Amino acid sequence: MHPSVHARANPDKPAIVMAASGETITYAELDRRSNQVAQLLRSRRIGIGDTVAMCLENHPWFFCLAWGFQRAGVHYVGISSRLTAPEVAYILSDSGANMLFGSAYLAPVLDELARIAPDVPQLRFDTPDTMSAEAAIAAMPSEPIADERAGTDMLYSSGTTGRPKGVRIPLPEDPAIDAPNVLMQLAMAAYGLSDRSVYLSPAPLYHAAPLRWSMTIHKLGGTVVVMEKFDPEVTLATIQQYGIDAGQFVPTHFVRMLKLPAEARAKYDVSTLKCAIHAAAPCPVPVKRAMIEWWGPVLFEYYAGTEGNGSTFITSPEWLAKPGSVGRALSGVVHICDENGDDVPTGTEGQIFFEPTDPTAKPFEYHNDPVKTAESRNKHGWTSLGDVGRVDEDGYLFLTDRKSFMIISGGVNIYPQEIENLLVTHPKVADAAVVGGPDPDMGERVIAVVQPLDMADAGPELEAELREYLAPQLSRIKMPKQIDFIEQLPREATGKLYKRHLRDAYWAAAKETA
């Protein structure tokens, strides 16, 4: 169903609650505002199939915009609020956005953007001037537009391995704004979500999972509680305060909550949780096991991408029987392929591809990048996100790492994820990344970049402690040849790491000293 249906049935029910302030937007208000947003687009001659963008923090208006865009039949681009003006300008240009919505919080970036991308008109929230988004929207009729048609998101990757890639998915075949989608059906069948769900969204809404899962809750008629930003202890307090029974997390969230002092963790009642969904990155086995011991068997993991080409799913009981797995296929058929695109034997590592179960479905494309689009497909027409893994005899998928992150040292393929998963379980480590740096003898050397819980611990003693910790668990070829310490790793709030930035720095430094 569409939020407009719930607005008629339960107009006063909270659709959105901002966790910190308690500001609440009812379904009636969400419906009214989204109609006005759609009317505004038409008044600016933005029609079906056009593109609009929003560069916002987790803002009360975020979903009002998203649902307005959805019922106006446009492609809507969520842009990271952490980007610089040139980075935002690139996405606006690449996507062909006709309009940008921002906020006063991002005024310095948006002011610079107005200078370097003057052709894209802006409206801003919390700005009492001629660019006021609230004023422009309030002036519009609150009735539905005459040509309502379902739109869809067009989201950009984090750019962790290069320029951000826009994932453009064709507008839905069914133009009805209230047509059910696959995610909604899966949310009910696999995750048990419903109109009674009180769903926590602790991550930035401009990313695929927070945006799509939250909008799915709105389709079901539940309540979405939005955290302005993630904080481990505040998350626990929010679960208790609002009686949260579902939410979407990433492994980094789990690590940070687990590393809270025991007395802080014990202060909060999280027994209302029935469904803690997680994805975005492989979760270290000890971390997930500890979360299940703490929260109970309520963790549900899936593997999928912004591209929407397929997914897997696993429950906590299944995972305890198959630790480390991301589950069996939920949508699409999983294939593990060699370099020629052929299936490899069961249990053998290879590149993960999804075969569509609906042969009429239109595949995604990387916007304005036909080469990247072609690289994501093999000779069978199956699509891949570039990840490597294996499938066991029962059909359970195990992730190894991204193909592009692989380190080749002395002719041996080394996947950083295995080493990173061990490092983050050390009690003095907050976060870790492993990259390949130049080595005159081996081609590449394994470098671990470690973010300590306390930067005062950084130094030779902690390095020795980490080596001693890793030694029984890693072969010598995988042991980091170099361990460096950093105050903060360049990680997205969704858990994705800008590993390219780290790797490039080591290779650039080597060139300068050559």
PLM-predicted stretches and their roles:
Residues 175-198, 202, 206-246, 260:
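Conserved AMP-binding/adenylation subdomain of ANL enzymes
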Residues 83, 100-102, 237, 247, ...:
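AMP-binding/adenylate-forming catalytic core of the ANL superfamily
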Residues 15-59, 66-67, 84-89:
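Conserved AMP-binding/adenylate-forming core of the ANL superfamily
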Residues 153-155, 159, 219-220, 244-249, ...:
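Gly/Ser/Thr-rich phosphate-binding loop
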Residues 51, 57-85, 94-99, 197-198, ...:
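A short helix-loop-beta submotif of the ANL/AMP-binding
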Residues 3, 43-44, 67, 71-147:
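Structural core segment of the AMP-binding/adenylate-forming
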Residues 11-12, 138-158, 162-163, 191-198:
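Conserved pre-ATP/AMP-binding loop-to-beta segment of ANL
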Residues 24-28, 152-181:
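Conserved AMP-binding A3 loop
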